[in-house]
Amino acid sequence: MSVIFETHAHYEDEAFDEDRDELIKSLPESGIGYVVNVGSSIATCHRTVELIKHYDYMYGALGIHPGEIHEVTDDDMKWIETEAKTNPKIVSVGEIGLDYYWMESSKEEQKKFFKAQIELAKKLDMPIIVHDRDAHGDTLDILRETKPKGVVHCFSGSKEMAREIIKLGMYIGLNGVVTFNNARKSLEVAKEIPIERL
């Protein structure tokens, strides 16, 4: 039987409070052999570190989502760096990137913070998990400039953008949108991506 590696989960979320342990323990029976739980705020990063202690098959990613950067201190970022350096179960920096839909912080602040987190990932020799919402051009420009390892999660860009990301050696994550009846664009993009880059 093949084993699924779930690369992007948020089991620390309060939506799982009632049955989190039961659900996570059932994952191996469902064919899910490994899970990366992804932090997106300083609070969810702390919860991720606590959560992954309890399951051998669960790993963590620590990073600050663009909608949360206004809440983060220098001490928080030092904690993330130290935890990523010293905890062998931290495997990635994410979820990081740009979000021009919600605009919790200015575009310039988001770009600066995105680049800083990419530099942290490179210093740690870790891949990144990229969040890109309504910011395709700037996201691609920063990825071209910094050339990190990683995945653009929940990809919503064009097939041309997908080709560029693949040229950079990165991966593309697609979500359930590709199953929707009106998901023509997502399906066209999916056809362009080599299976080894999904």
Specify the residue positions occupied by each region the protein language model found.
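Mid-domain alpha/beta scaffold segments of enzyme catalytic cores
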Residues: 1-198
